[in-house]
Regions:
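C-terminal catalytic lobe of pepsin-like aspartyl proteases
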Residues: 1-147
Length: 147
């Protein structure tokens, strides 16, 4: 049933091979699995770990502009996106997210959570056309994860 969800004990979390929530040293947390959507909500620590992992991976690439916002009141890490970049152009840079439930590692490819957006921030219906030589793209690629 696509409207069902389950609460499970989240024991660990990794982005690629980087341990963000260590099951050996940290207490488990409640995790919810929703089989009806692609929305993933993770603890703030895990969200920040993924975003910092992405930032570390692309920081030396001058063709990629990865931007994260901060929440005005709490200064917590907010939405992150690739500016002036199509999702198809960055999916090869993404590592998978790995969740540990019941001592089993489950892997999700993060490109399932990348959404192309237009310059006004609206999700586009289909992937943008390839960018030709000398052309620029004024949209972006949003990471659809939430803390």
């Amino acid at each position: 049933n696509p409207t069902m969800y389950w609460g499970v004990e989240g024991q660990g979390f990794l982005y690629g091979d980087k341990i963000i929530m260590d099951p050996e040293h940290e207490s488990p947390t409640l995790a919810v699995i929703d089989s009806g959507t692609t929305l993933v909500m993770v603890p703030s620590k895990c969200y920040e770990g993924v975003m910092m992992g992405i930032a570390d991976k692309v920081k030396d690439d001058p063709s990629v502009s990865f931007v994260c916002t901060r929440e005005e009141d709490s200064k917590a890490l907010g939405a992150c996106y690739f500016n002036n970049t199509r999702c198809l152009d960055v999916t090869h840079l993404m590592d998978p997210m790995k969740f540990i439930f019941g001592n089993v590692v489950y892997e999700l490819k993060i490109d399932a959570f990348l959404k192309d957006v237009s310059a006004n921030g609206k999700v586009v219906d289909s992937p943008p056309s390839p960018i030709g030589p000398g052309e620029t793209y004024d949209g972006g690629c949003m990471v659809e994860l939430r803390p």
